Amino acid sequence: MSITKSIGSFIDSTLIDLGRQFRWSYLPPLMIYVAAGVSGLTGIVGIFFIKDYLNLSAAFLAGLGFWAGIPWALKMPLGHLVDLIWSRKNYLVFVGAALIALSIIIMYGLIIHTETMVSVFKVETWFIISALLAPVGYVVQDVVADAMTVEAVPSTDDQGIKYSDQKIKIMHTTMQTLGRFAIIGGFVLVALVNVFMFAGVSALSESEKIEIYGRIYLYALIIPVVSVSGVFLAMYLKKRRLEQLIKSGVGDEELNRLTTEFEVTTEPNWWILGGSLVFVIFTLGIGILKVPFAQEIVFLGSTLIILFLMKKLITELPEKSRFMIVGTAIIIFVFRAMPGPGPGLSWFEIDVLNFDQQFFSTLSLIASVLTLVGIVIFRPFMAKNSIAKIIVVLSIVGSILFLPSVGMYYGFHNWTSSLTNGLVDARFIAIVNTALESPLGQVSMIPLLAWIAKNAPAHLKATFFAIFASFTNLALSANALGSKYLNEIFVVTRAVKDKVTNVILSTADYSELGIILISVTLLTLLVPILAVWLIQKSKFRTNE
């Protein structure tokens, strides 16, 4: 086979085939996923606003990341609720959109109308309220989007002819791949907007920067609009499919079966509802009472409750599938639980390497585009290889992407800059180093989600999505805890001044950031690979 034919075959199997597999029914959940991706629109504003105006420590911010992650564990009762109210689940998208809009409006008020907002609550209090409202809104929408991905893959074509099992499996994998693609596509859109919005920002005065920050929060109100539009599109497509089936001469009985094939009567599972209620009361109680080691207690308690519910739920599966899905979930959990460096790395890049808002936007754009390319290129790899092999590859890639950050902390960029007449400087290295919030974790979720969409019992699809997503999302809480510990052991501080009085509240100290970066790199490489090795030696061995 010639090189040209090989390249043509590769492009066909990765890029063109993805386009061929696309169906209009995939679009409504994809719109909700895009809205979730676009949620990062305010991320760079957040980094600079927190750094310059909020006197919150790196450890506190990592801790806030923990609490912001807890609503994602609410996917359990919400997922089961979706199964119970399947035909009316779209209303939950409106609830989520309202919470997201409220969170955005609070931040807009905080930036543009600071004095008015401060007369009600402290700046830090408003920030915490906003930071906790948004994830609740996104989790509500995400649960519905997951359920919509199941509906997006029909069992028959528009003539009522049944698809083969293999065809349905391919459609589910494509739907889940496009779901991750949509989320990261949202990141790309965000980065493009930020690059444009922050053009020449370093030359602007403080008040002009504040004005741009506020404008970005106003633009972020497009997020709830997009997700709500997805619901209306789903209603339209359902009506159109019904008309096409009638036109094809499908009988009334078959028509009723096809249009309600996902509306299976589900009995309330009181273990799931009761366990979820215990979880919510437990989490809020510990948080409100300000118990010592609250985050650790909540994490351990949440893990035990979710594991108990998983044990109850997987009894619905055949024995072989039970062990396999547990092994798969554990491997993904460990991979996603590896700690990050915390906000100290971004502060160091701003203060010492002089990265500005526009350059951060450029970095996140490059990271997101490369991840999109990665998903397209690795789709055949993901379809043909086990999750164990995928996680090993992602761990190696993730740790390699941290090396430039470690190097730059120790002045590697000064050496390369002097060697190349200023060409390979800190910014050049940072562009190559796309590890900044790189969403590789999204890739690891695709095989698990596709497996659930295809194999979970029809009456518990949303519940399965929710329980296993809650478990893998708990890993992000473990990630936040790990980051908090690293930032408590090795303390990193940045300069902060009061927004109203301009009094300096704290000074910068990055002397211990290097140890944090080295620790993160080693953990990212070694721990997931060790977990894969242990699982593959046990009865939980996964070939999925």
Positions of predicted regions on the chain:
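Intracellular loop-helix junctions on the cytosolic face of multi-pass helical membrane proteins
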Residues: M1-W24, T116-V118, K122-I128, A152-P341, ...
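Helix-loop boundary and gating motifs at the non-cytosolic
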Residues: I3-W72, L133, F279-Q295, M324-L353, ...
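Conserved glycine-rich helix-kink/hinge and helix-boundary motifs of the Major Facilitator Superfamily
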Residues: L30, A62, F94, I170-T173, ...
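Substrate-agnostic recognition of the 12-TM MFS/MFS-like secondary transporter fold
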Residues: I32-Y33, F66-W72, W126-M197, M338-P341, ...
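Transmembrane alpha-helical segments of major facilitator superfamily
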Residues: L64-W72, I223, T303, T362-T371, ...
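Helix-to-loop junctions at the C-terminal end of transmembrane segments
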Residues: W72-R88, F198, V373-V393, H413, ...
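Transmembrane alpha-helix termini and helix-breaking/packing motifs in multi-pass membrane transporters
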Residues: H80-W86, I111-M117, I184-E211, T283-F293, ...
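C-terminal ends and interior cores of transmembrane alpha-helices
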Residues: A97-F121, I396-L423
